[in-house]
C-alpha cells in the first residue's frame, strides 16, 4: 500500500537498516529493475499528477473530468529540483520532461545507478530535441510504460536540457542545495533510519514556499510476510507521518 504526500515549507522513530546491504541488492538488480517494477512506474506517474495538481495549481488548468492540461507559455514553478532515491530514473525522467527545471540533482545510495541514468547526464547521450505538446498518447523519453492514461502537463514546447547531476550517497546525510524548490522521491523513505531528522533537514534546504513531495509504503505492505517471519521494515501510518511533518510543514495533500 502506497501513500502520496505533497508538503509545503512553512515523536521520532529510528530503525536499524543495513544500508550497505540495501545498496548491494539494488545495484545487483539494476539491469532488470526498470523492466519489472511496473508498480513503481505507476506510483511515479501518479506522484507527478498529484504534484502538478496540488503543489503548482497556477501552472495548470483543470478540466471537469479531473485531468490536468498544460497552459500555453507557462514556465515550470520548480526551477531547482532534488530527487533522492532516484534508482533507475523512472520518476527522474517524468520530472525532467514534465517540469523542465533549470537544475535537477539526482541522488541514490547506489553509485551503480549512474549507468541507468547516463543518458540524462552531461557525459551521456544528449536528450532528443522534440516538441513536448500535450497528447493522450505521448510516451515520455525513457519511460518503460506508455503514459496513455497519465495525462501529465508538459511545460513549454522545445525540450531544454537542464543541468542534471548525480550524487551517490546516503540522502539522510546529504546537504541539498540551499534554496531548492522541490525535494521529491518515490518509494524511498521507508529505507530511512531517522525520518523526522530527514524532514528537518529538508525544511532547512527548501526555498521559501518550497515543496517536499514523496510516496512511501504503509503499514500493510508485506504484512503477511512480517506476521509469519517477524522480520520487515517498520512503516509509518499516515497520521504518524503527518505528525512528524506538522511542526515545520503545511500538508497540502495526503492519501492512503
Regions found by a protein language model. Name each.
Residues 1-7:
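Short, small-residue-biased leader/transition segments that mark boundaries at the very start
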Residues 38-57:
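Conserved alpha-helix/loop element of class I SAM-dependent methyltransferases that forms part
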Residues 80-136, 142, 156-174:
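Class I SAM-dependent methyltransferase SAM/SAH-binding core
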Residues 172-183:
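A short acidic, Gly/Pro-enriched loop at the edge of an enzyme's catalytic core
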Residues 181-195:
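A short SAM/SAH-binding and catalytic strip from SAM-dependent methyltransferases
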Residues 196-211:
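A short glycine-rich, Lys/Arg-flanked "PGG" loop and its adjoining helix->strand segment in the class I
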Residues 211-240:
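Conserved class I S-adenosyl-L-methionine
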Residues 234-256:
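Substrate-binding/catalytic lobe of Class I Rossmann-like enzymes that use SAM or dcSAM, i.e.
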